[in-house]
């Protein structure tokens, strides 16, 4: 595995098969893990095509495994960055860390993608009730 991020809050590695392994560390690791899992599941259910898909979630570690959304973007126009994060809100999520470091480029389909949802918020009106209906 190749380390791509090693900080006090997270260790992110890319496996030889391309999957992304993110282990949460530090303060409130369990809460950040639970939030990222919840947001990724919401985005998948909403059909958002430009975020990773959650493949595994282990609350004991706490660790998630996701699909790979490409490589980090080195240069990105400020207007385009803002547009990407704004587009996410159409799927009911505010990223809450709208920095360039959370933008990747997926060469397979030529698409910019967004990653790292541990601080994201599901917007009012998009929350699901236990029966699956939106509030």
Question: What is each model feature region?
Answer:
Residues 40, 85-88, 92:
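Hydrophobic core positions within the conserved protein kinase catalytic domain
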Residues 11-13, 54, 102-104:
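Short acidic loop-to-beta-strand element that houses the catalytic metal-binding Asp/Glu
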Residues 25, 29-33, 41-84:
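Conserved structural core of kinase catalytic domains
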Residues 1-42:
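ATP-binding glycine-rich loop module of kinase domains
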Residues 12-13, 18-22, 51, 65, ...:
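Short hydrophobic-acidic sequence motifs that mark active-site Asp/Glu residues
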Residues 17-18, 62, 101, 110:
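Beta-strand-connecting loop/turn residues
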Residues 76-80, 89-96, 101, 106-135:
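C-lobe/activation-segment region of protein kinase-like
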Residues 15, 58-60, 106-108:
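Structural motif
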């Amino acid at each position: 595995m190749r380390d791509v991020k090693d900080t006090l809050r997270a260790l992110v590695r890319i496996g030889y098969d391309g999957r992304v392994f993110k282990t949460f560390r530090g303060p409130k690791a369990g809460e950040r893990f639970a939030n990222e899992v919840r947001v990724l599941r919401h985005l998948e259910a909403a059909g958002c095509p430009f975020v990773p898909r959650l493949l595994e979630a282990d609350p004991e570690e706490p660790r998630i495994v996701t699909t790979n959304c490409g490589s980090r973007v080195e240069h990105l126009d400020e207007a385009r960055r803002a547009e990407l994060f704004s587009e996410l809100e159409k799927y009911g999520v505010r990223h809450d860390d709208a920095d360039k470091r959370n933008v990747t480029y997926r060469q397979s389909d030529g698409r910019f993608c967004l990653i790292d949802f541990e601080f994201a918020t599901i917007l009012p009106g998009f929350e699901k009730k236990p029966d699956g209906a939106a509030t």
